[in-house]
A protein has these predicted regions:
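A generic structural signal for short coil/turn motifs at secondary-structure boundaries
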Residues: 23-25, 131-134
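Short Gly/Pro-enriched loop/turn and capping motifs at secondary-structure junctions
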Residues: 56, 100-105, 130-131
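Thr-Gly-centered strand-to-loop micro-motif
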Residues: 98-99, 125
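Histidine/acidic-residue-rich catalytic or RNA/ligand-binding cores of hydrolases
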Residues: 106-111, 133-142
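Short acidic/histidine-rich active-site segments
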Residues: 123-130
Length: 152
């Protein structure tokens, strides 16, 4: 499908959400799993990749050993985002991160700062916008834009 889309000048956008098999809820957002999902989307030809922000969980025992051996820092969201960006052809793909469950404003702004600092290309902010009154949502979005612009 990606070759067909590219042949007619369309960008390929892929939601790369790992699910199924033996993967549990914690595994869906584990750093090793999210980074691999982003990498696979890039290999499949995606120009734009959407993944969930990764947690500091390492789901696969083999990955945990490899991360420890390579001394990969996974302690903060920005470090984990940077790792996902590296897995996406070292930043040569656009990677946006889902907003997830509704959060309080400070929690959301803290997450957006971590995404920005890790090199994310953006956020998909759905329910965090639409589940708020219009004026509050617009103010929130203005602040998020300011964060990505480095003004906040």
């Amino acid at each position: 499908m990606s070759l067909e889309a590219k042949s007619v000048g369309l960008a390929v956008v892929m939601w790369s959400y790992p699910r199924g098999g033996k993967l549990d809820k914690a595994g869906e957002t584990a750093l090793d799993v999210c980074a691999y999902a982003a990498h696979m989307a890039a290999l499949l030809g995606a120009h734009i990749i959407k993944v969930k922000p990764p947690t500091d969980v390492l789901w696969q025992p083999e990955a945990k050993a490899a991360y420890e051996k390579a001394s990969i820092d996974i302690s903060t969201l920005d470090k984990r985002i940077a790792h996902v960006m590296q897995a996406s052809f070292n930043g040569r793909r656009i990677v946006v991160f889902s907003g997830g469950e509704a959060k309080d404003l400070e929690g959301l702004f803290t997450e957006v700062r971590g995404l920005r600092d890790g090199g994310a290309n953006g956020s998909i902010i759905g329910r965090n916008t639409f589940q708020r009154p219009r004026e509050q949502a617009l103010d929130m979005l203005d602040k998020i834009v300011g964060i990505y612009q480095g003004k906040m």
